Amino acid sequence: MYTHNMDESRIRAEQLLTLSSAGRRLSDLVSAATAPLRYEVMRHLLRVSEETMTETLEEVVELHLVRRGPDPFTYVPFDEATGEAISTSIDPERLTRLRAQIASAALRVFE
């Protein structure tokens, strides 16, 4: 059992090393959000094409960092442990900035 967990952790670490910059930003945004994050808000913040957004979502979903939320147009951390691990790895000042950016983008997108 202990060896299995080590192997799983090593594999997970290798996966995270290959994560694209957009994938990292997306997983950070979803983990920083205090509520399920809408697709439109994520795309606005990432400033990427529809195609790149789709590819980035596929990447983070496949790595079990993010999953669809209760509404099919929202996204949340894959599970509580994943969300906690990502959000605690973010500098507190950056976390505050990300949350402010999310709030501002949500207002602009849905005006």
At which residue positions do the language-model features occur?
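Short secondary-structure boundary elements
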Residues: 1-111
